[in-house]
Amino acid sequence: MNHEELINSLTKKMNGALQVLDADLKGLRVGQASAYFLDPVQVEAYNSRVPILQVATISVSDTKTILVQVWDKSLVKAVKKAIMEANLGVSIISDDNQIIRLQLPIPSEERRKELVKIAHKYQEKSKIIVRNIRRDGIELIKQMEQNTECSKDEAHIYSKEIQELTDKYCDKIDKIIKLKEQDIINL
């Protein structure tokens, strides 16, 4: 693997860390209803636990209401139970046949602070992923140096580039979290 391939590979992996962060943050409800809000819900169906998206269609009717249309009428109770057990702080306001309406309350100040803490945990998790990618990249540079694929000076330059890439992605993570924090606080 040459220097350019290594940097491209590390960049791709670090972009993956940003995608994981984005997916994590979509699960944090801040002000508006989102179809992603129910992603963590697992339903007991057909003798196993499955994601809610495998048994229902989720849509948003307005900023505070999520509609869950269960495909199989026999699973409506299981879906309602799974939503309640997920402890997402939603109220089931009606269930017309196979459609369950969920009302999202405006988060209290305490809940917003809790959401900010959760966002910061996601931030740290993402930074750890990026730093582990950096560590792996630097290990590869050291191996290249030992195998005389690059000189000591080149290895130093490559390591510095990897560190700059790491700093760039850590800054991106910080900016994403700062924006999310502002969204949460300014509800």
From Swiss-Prot:
Claim: Zinc is one of the keywords in the record: no
Any one GO MF annotation of this record: ribosomal large subunit binding
GO biological process annotation, one example: cytoplasmic translational termination
Keywords, sorted A to Z: Cytoplasm, Protein biosynthesis
Keyword Cytoplasm (UniProt): yes
Principal place of residence: cytoplasm
GO cellular-component term (any): cytosol
NCBIfam families per the UniProt record, alphabetical: frr
Family: Belongs to the RRF family.
HAMAP family, per database record: RRF
Protein name stated in the entry: Ribosome-recycling factor
Species the sequence originates in: Orientia tsutsugamushi (strain Boryong) (Rickettsia tsutsugamushi)
Organism phylogeny: Bacteria, Pseudomonadati, Pseudomonadota, Alphaproteobacteria, Rickettsiales
Gene: frr
